[in-house]
């Protein structure tokens, strides 16, 4: 059994970016849900602003990209032992089940760090494309609770249930990530044919009984999650190439991979009324919000959206990952919220069951910033002009204040002698203050233009981090 296989991770990461441009492009049209409970929950979700994403599976033992190294797409590369023999490699990958034992698993520790940083919802990978279930499914033995998995002997082996329960106790909204494709399942990648790419490796139209078995398998797994894991707010479905297709042809890209999402949604909402469905990139009534990946739209969108982004370079645990600096994470959150979106920030647990210590430090830095500036994030909505130069705006939903985030180029904020910007649709301001400071500011507001004089002491102070946030009360 290979304990470690080294991959060309830089190439893999770049290739995934190129792949994402084709398969993970955000939808540009939107269908408002007919169900009033779904609309209500969407409003609640939009108020959360900041969520935690976690990609975790047996692949963390090798420190490689989640699932994709067993995919035969021509953009995938792998090096090291077995790299020249796909089927031997895939067998070794699947045997990672027999050594997976994340003994340091402690979801309450994650809850404390996430809550302090201002996160309010969590989305966890119950199953990624490789098909390994991180929950106690009855549909397959390729799962964390199977006796072949060492961690199955742990009383907390059903990690999906443990994660959901721990976060729910602290009032987080709960999201179940679920991969529609399943590269372990014989009814998706049938061993009669070699897999050619990430798609189903046979034409469902030619083998309808086999495809029906896969549809039933998918339905049953989702029903398990919806019926046996407490309150779930979001069903986050990945693998957008698995969708109905009006086109026909021999190219797998044109195969009709229809899972009957209407049936899945009806069943799911019978257990979870108001459930937010995120059939990402598919567009239509089952994509209740859109999910730009690793990018921030350059302007507000007219429908609910969420940027999903990694805290480092990779979605999965990779040793020596390059974590984004705290200033980038905070300022990305500001930009997203100013444009009406949510940030779903991914932190990947390692093979031992815990996060990299750097991830905890990043969340602590965000927590420290939130202690001063959260007023401009929560209970806010976008307001024109949204941004001007390095200043980004939000408005309180109670229509009593506008917040202007002056973004710093360095971690320590050095404000200039004066700051000026336009303020739209406010006839009169009552008060202008700097969050985190008790010093009074001199300011002038005429014809929609606000000019703020910054005292010398504040200009020289570096007590503020990442942004200087002005509160404009009216």
Model segments located where?
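Bacterial Sec-dependent N-terminal signal peptides
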Residues: 1-23
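Mature catalytic domains of secreted/periplasmic carbohydrate-active enzymes
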Residues: 21-474
């Amino acid at each position: 059994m290979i304990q470690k296989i080294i991959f060309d991770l830089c190439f893999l990461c770049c290739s995934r970016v190129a792949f994402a441009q084709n398969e993970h492009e955000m939808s540009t049209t939107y269908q408002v849900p007919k169900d009033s409970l779904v609309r209500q929950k969407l409003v609640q979700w939009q108020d959360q602003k900041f969520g935690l994403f976690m990609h975790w599976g047996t692949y963390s033992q090798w420190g490689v990209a989640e699932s994709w190294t067993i995919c035969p797409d021509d953009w995938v590369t792998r090096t090291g032992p077995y790299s020249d023999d796909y089927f031997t490699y895939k067998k070794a990958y699947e045997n990672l089940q027999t050594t997976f034992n994340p003994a340091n698993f402690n979801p309450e520790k994650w809850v404390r760090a996430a809550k302090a940083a201002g996160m309010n919802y969590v989305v966890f990978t119950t199953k990624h494309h490789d098909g390994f279930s991180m929950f106690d499914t009855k549909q397959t033995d390729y799962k964390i609770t199977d006796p072949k998995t060492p961690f199955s002997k742990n009383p907390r082996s059903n990690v999906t249930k443990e994660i959901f329960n721990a976060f729910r106790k602290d009032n987080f909204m709960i999201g179940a990530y679920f991969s529609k494709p399943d590269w372990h399942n014989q009814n998706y990648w049938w061993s009669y044919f070699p897999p050619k790419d990430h798609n189903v490796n046979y034409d469902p139209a030619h083998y309808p009984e086999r495809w029906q078995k896969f549809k039933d398998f998918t339905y049953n797994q989702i029903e398990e999650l919806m019926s046996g894991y407490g309150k779930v707010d979001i069903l986050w479905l990945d693998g957008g190439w698995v969708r109905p297709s009006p086109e026909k042809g021999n190219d797998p890209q044109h195969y009709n991979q229809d899972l009957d999402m209407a049936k899945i949604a009806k069943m799911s909402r019978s257990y979870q009324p108001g459930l937010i469905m995120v059939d990402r990139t598919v567009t239509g009534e089952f994509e209740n919000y859109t999910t730009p990946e690793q990018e921030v739209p350059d302007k507000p969108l007219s429908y609910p959206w969420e940027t999903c982004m990694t805290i480092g370079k990779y979605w999965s645990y990779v040793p020596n990952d390059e974590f984004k600096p705290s200033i980038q994470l905070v300022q990305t959150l500001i930009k997203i919220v100013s444009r009406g979106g949510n940030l779903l920030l991914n932190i990947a647990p390692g093979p031992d069951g815990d996060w990299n210590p750097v991830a905890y430090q990043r969340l602590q830095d965000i927590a420290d910033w939130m202690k001063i500036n959260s007023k401009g994030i929560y209970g806010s909505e976008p307001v024109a002009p949204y941004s001007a130069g390095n200043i980004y705006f939000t408005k309180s939903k109670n229509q009593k204040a506008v917040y202007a985030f002056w973004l710093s180029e360095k971690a320590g904020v050095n404000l200039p002698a004066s700051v000026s910007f336009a303020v739209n649709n406010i006839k009169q301001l009552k008060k202008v203050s700097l969050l985190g400071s008790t010093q009074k500011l001199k300011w002038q507001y005429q014809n929609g233009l606000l000019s703020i004089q910054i005292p010398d002491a504040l200009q020289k102070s570096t007590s503020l981090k990442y942004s200087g946030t002005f509160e404009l009360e009216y």
